[in-house]
Amino acid sequence: MSKKIITFSIIVLMSFLCFSCKDEVLPKPSSYLRLDYPEAEYANFETNHCPFTFEMNSEAVIKGENDCGFTVSYPKMKATIYLTYKPVNNNINKLLRDAQKLTYSHVIKADNILEQPYLNSNKKVFGMFYQVNGNAATNSQFYATDSTKHFVTGSVYFYAKPNFDSIMPAASYVKNDMRRLMETLKWK
């Protein structure tokens, strides 16, 4: 009888050890797709009816409007830069206030807004580049002016729910293009 109990105990103990040695099942963490984009190649963009030119990435698709407003689309990234032109008619303070108001309307969702002044005295282009960090609707905006005749604003939007971590590679790529656009802006 004791031999049966010992044998049974050993079998139970061995089966317990064999089946309890498995690794714990852990859920897979969420991950995001790694996105690589081609190196940007820039070309000058100019129209006959607008008083400015700029350089733009060859990956972008530019659609113009009669009032010198443009949409610069990145179909692969589901992103669009919206450019708006306004002539300055003794209203520079209002234009500046409106541009700043547009940027700071995102402060509710933004973690941080970095202001980076831009000044090119040779080309008479002055402005501000804004980098909006966090889950805001836009992650980059700018305005540029000569303060007497011309005023251009730009902002980038993604056709996706704003999740800063998941759109970061595309947002960084488009932000660099938008900065290049602002820095190559020339008045006619």
Predicted segments, located by residue:
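C-terminal motif of bacterial Sec signal peptides marking the signal peptidase cleavage site
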Residues: 16-20
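Signature of long, low-cysteine stretches enriched in small and polar/charged residues
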Residues: 100-155
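Bacterial signal peptide processing site
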Residues: 22-25
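Surface-exposed amphipathic alpha-helical segments
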Residues: 155-188
